[in-house]
């Protein structure tokens, strides 16, 4: 991969909407407030779905906000140059998003009571989703083949760095009372129970009919048709023809794309990198 994208502290970032100065300020100077709710993921791990769910929980299922405000405005990415300004201007309680690895996250979070919801996904599916997503985006060098992107991914030479380091970093926080770790697979398998778990974590009591509305308006089909959620409002300069954010929304799609050799090579590195974690910690081991 050619070096035409910005780097900060050893991590590659997209070519647009980022600067080392803002990333440094976010880490060192941004003040996280106790009332903040922050959704955090490695890219292509259910970020926008989780954001939709959280926004709908906070509105008790009322879809007005998610149908009238683009997702990057209602839950801005704090590390984006524009998103950072939006977060600073938000009224309390603030809701925002990040893909940042733990060591680049705002330092003030670690002495706050702010709530972080971290969603993990089978890295094989995150890889395949990332490949198709970045193949149609003008924010970093486009992979020519899945094999090429897999090599970049396993080397950590992709935007936001290594999946393994990202997940290991955030999993180290999983016993903290203000951090909730979820999996994309659980969201797919039992959406209602996972939504209820998020409600409990956020201290929000929803009536059954309100939970029904959250499930309805955060469903794949509703989000796919909602221009405030499906990224069709992105400037055309950022995307190429055929771009889609919500491609499949399924579990195990990697099996349709990995060769046997690729699956074996990935598994070898996965076992090395994730040694020491109990398999039951990861829902995809059961899928």
Swiss-Prot record:
Organism: Cavia porcellus
Phylogenetic placement of the source organism: Eukaryota, Metazoa, Chordata, Craniata, Vertebrata
EC annotation from Swiss-Prot or TrEMBL: 2.8.2.2
Disulphide bonds in the chain: none
Positions of the catalytic residues: 99 (proton acceptor)
Cellular localization per UniProt: Cytoplasm
Protein name: 3-alpha-hydroxysteroid sulfotransferase
Protein family according to the UniProt entry: Belongs to the sulfotransferase 1 family.
Function: Sulfotransferase that utilizes 3'-phospho-5'-adenylyl sulfate (PAPS) as sulfonate donor to catalyze the sulfonation of 3-alpha-hydroxyl groups of neutral steroids.
